[in-house]
């Protein structure tokens, strides 16, 4: 495994984690907002 492929995989993992985190946060906000109303 070369350094370039490790860097590439790391970038993909980071992007996926950010997207999942945003989706999860958005979901929690919608759920909390629904309960508050």
UniProtKB/Swiss-Prot annotation:
User: Gene Ontology terms, cellular component aspect?
Assistant: cytochrome b6f complex; plasma membrane-derived thylakoid membrane
Q: Where in the cell is it found?
A: Cellular thylakoid membrane
In which broad location class does this protein mainly occur, judging by the first location in its UniProt entry?
A: membrane
Q: Which UniProt keywords apply?
A: Electron transport, Membrane, Photosynthesis, Thylakoid, Transmembrane, Transmembrane helix, Transport
Membrane topology recorded in Swiss-Prot or TrEMBL: Single-pass membrane protein
Protein name in UniProt:
Cytochrome b6-f complex subunit 7
* Entry superkingdom: Bacteria
What family is this protein classified in? Belongs to the PetM family.
The reply to whether Transport figures as a keyword in the UniProt entry is yes
Under the subunit heading, UniProt states:
The 4 large subunits of the cytochrome b6-f complex are cytochrome b6, subunit IV (17 kDa polypeptide, PetD), cytochrome f and the Rieske protein, while the 4 small subunits are PetG, PetL, PetM and PetN. The complex functions as a dimer.
Q: Any idea what job this protein has?
A: Component of the cytochrome b6-f complex, which mediates electron transfer between photosystem II (PSII) and photosystem I (PSI), cyclic electron flow around PSI, and state transitions.
